[in-house]
Amino acid sequence: MKVLIIGSGGREHALAWKVAQDPRVEKVFVAPGNAGTAIEAKCENVAIDVCALEQLADFAEKNVDLTIVGPEAPLVIGVVDLFRSRGLDCFGPTKGAAQLEGSKAFTKDFLARHEIPTADYQNFTEIEPALAYLQEKGAPIVIKADGLAAGKGVIVAMTLEEAEAAVRDMLAGNAFGEAGSRVVIEEFLDGEEASFIVMVDGHNVLPMATSQDHKRVGDQDTGPNTGGMGAYSPAPVVTADVHQRVMDQVIWPTVRGMAEEGNVYTGFLYAGLMIDKAGNPKVIEFNCRFGDPETQPVMLRLESSLVLLVEAAFAKALDKVEAQWDPRPSLGVVLAAGGYPGDYAKGDVINGLDAAAKIEGKVFHAGTALKDGKVTTNGGRVLCATAMGSTVADAQQQAYRLAKEVSWNGSFYRSDIGYRAIARERGEHQQ
């Protein structure tokens, strides 16, 4: 069989790599893909943009049996609706269901309607009422641009001045284009974050392995937010008890609530959670797709065929399958271009990939391109060095062995990915 993966990031390289491992799969097309998917066994890039929906559907109709969507942008504009209208299997939520990620305001209102735990909040489109609300609530406080801002439209303001500047920026300056024309202001939640990703077939839910990502650009969680600088799986904060609470209080009410409201949810559903000291989960955000970089360590641990699981979802039979996981933890370190998440250079030649390929683990490509037979940088997050180990500390050590082999002009990475889990292993408890 043949499969199409839509996207060009590290997440899509990991999905394509995993799908290609199924012996029934002869070919994995990736649109538009990156240098990693260009050279991955069984994989081939297709030069179609992720938002060129008609072209994607035309290609899928002629060439593939099923499609898996990586990024949020095509989902929010209705790629699944179009594929379905043409009788094509496409794993992901419809445009209506993808509002869970496409609009922060839709999501907060949905959570309130269904009594799903989340931070207190209010939506604003005008500066004055927003500033008055800030005065009333004080800092720390969280300001979010309403639409898609590539994971960067969230400001955790530790002072009122910072909060007011963020509101002015998003509403008056419209720093995030269209996405910022409405803001959500919400209470600051204390605790530990976890990424809880499940597969949904409309009615049944199959949990994936838990993970924790590191959003801040600098060590010890300093500096601005990014799309994610590294991740590991599983997330020890999600104990068996917390897992049950998340399913009962967050995932099931969300899937049922969406169905009741006429937006039956299919695809990957990612709940970004804050877990407090008592183990109570609150929803920070939903994403309507697998996380990036969480996909990379999670796929490394998945022993089952991803294709089989997706087929079960199309058959509305996710309750009949189980996902098998390697019990060992895995950890991925993102290698980024100098200047990220701000402005960065593209087109630098990447050195050391051949040496890294000889070391245990896997270097997934994100912002890379093939130019004259050389792999060059083509984005802010460029690679993700991913490895497993008997402990998180071992997995971390192995991932950094990989990361150290690879470099280009201005490359950098965080040196402490997984620090919370490693502190737990050593018996130091950190919040």
Curated annotation (Swiss-Prot):
UniProt catalytic activity: 5-phospho-beta-D-ribosylamine + glycine + ATP = N(1)-(5-phospho-beta-D-ribosyl)glycinamide + ADP + phosphate + H(+)
Binding of Mg(2+), residues: E285, N287
Pathway named in the protein's UniProt entry: Purine metabolism; IMP biosynthesis via de novo pathway; N(1)-(5-phospho-D-ribosyl)glycinamide from 5-phospho-alpha-D-ribose 1-diphosphate: step 2/2
GO term, biological process aspect, one: 'de novo' IMP biosynthetic process
Cofactor binding, per record: Binds 1 Mg(2+) or Mn(2+) ion per subunit.
UniProt binding sites for ATP: 134-195
The UniProt record lists the keyword Phosphoprotein: no
GO molecular function, one term: metal ion binding
Coiled coil stretches, renumbered: none
Gene for this chain: purD
Source organism (scientific name): Pseudomonas putida (strain ATCC 47054 / DSM 6125 / CFBP 8728 / NCIMB 11950 / KT2440)
Protein name in the entry: Phosphoribosylamine--glycine ligase
Gene3D superfamilies noted in UniProt: 3.40.50.20, ATP-grasp fold, A domain, ATP-grasp fold, B domain, Phosphoribosylglycinamide synthetase, C-terminal domain
NCBIfam families reported for this sequence: purD
Family: Belongs to the GARS family.
Cofactor annotation: Mg(2+); Mn(2+)
Domain ATP-grasp: 108-315
Paired cysteines (S-S): none
Keyword Manganese: yes
Annotated keywords: ATP-binding, Ligase, Magnesium, Manganese, Metal-binding, Nucleotide-binding, Purine biosynthesis
